[in-house]
Amino acid sequence: YAPNYKWEAGKLVLKEGKVAGTDEYIEGKANITPNGQAITVEFSKATRNYSRLRIATMPNKPITVTIDRYTPAGSSDMKWDQKYALTSDEKGNAYLYGTFENNSEVTVKYREAALTTHTFSQATESAKSYALDATVISANSAEEIKSAIKQEVANSKTAIRLNLASDAGDNEFNAIREAFKNVRGNVQDGTIDLTLIGCKEIPADGLKELNALKSIFLPDVTKIGMNALFRCVYLEEICAPNVSTIDERAFAGFIMLEKVTLGELTDVRGEANSGGGIFGVTDNGDLNIDLYLPKNQEVMEFDENQYIWKPTGEKYFASPDYDNIFLGYQFMSVKKWE
């Protein structure tokens, strides 16, 4: 029983578009009648020479799973670096089939946001099922948000992941700020890695002055409002790989910021030299930040009449003289991500 495979020239080969390790590969003994007219396979005595890993996460979401030291079901070759693109079912489960070695590491991500990392302390056993928790707290109302953050802090969690409604707005983000204000005595500055999944926009002032934040991951956000992360002074990393619109001073007032990952920008407000740029005022426009942009990002040109940066049609990374300058700022480096 091997749904991912087909017979071809007397051998089992992967079907087109299928990847080893994403479905069962059960071997049973076949009994063939003397005249060859009937074949009986006893699956009650079939062997599973591999284990099953159930990944529990959000329903109907695409995830990527990266594994080292892993042998997929149906294969005898151990993979040192295997990456899978999976989609969870309606119950939030995704499955892998194979053998994980001692110290095998499994990392689950939703877009660029890490959901969990697990290292096996011993090799998995054949015919045995294992479960990996990559769940995210769903919090749609203000009260649910405050309760979730309070509970995560009480459980000494520093990686807080919330699944918000796509139209989450001022009420929900006020609740996030209030929740961190309420637990301030139990949270050290610059210790929280916050992931917000589902929401499409960070409103103006949405997450400003949150000293608890060390990093923030916004995999679904397409718009970031004015002063959205203003004076998050201990923030070291911002990852918003799908953002296209950013308003004035969205990231201004930082001290520790080192890495920023953005989507393909088409609409950016504010001019760097006037202090209205997205990173606020800097010394001569210099930033000690490594900036990551998608490979298709275009050069942005400032329109003084509209006070807005717009794409020119020229690919940024094809330009011979970009020299790590973007939106009027000089970065430590500007690199492309795919």
Please annotate each region the language model reported.
Residues 175-183, 202-213, 224-234, 246-257, ...:
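Core hydrophobic positions of leucine-rich repeats
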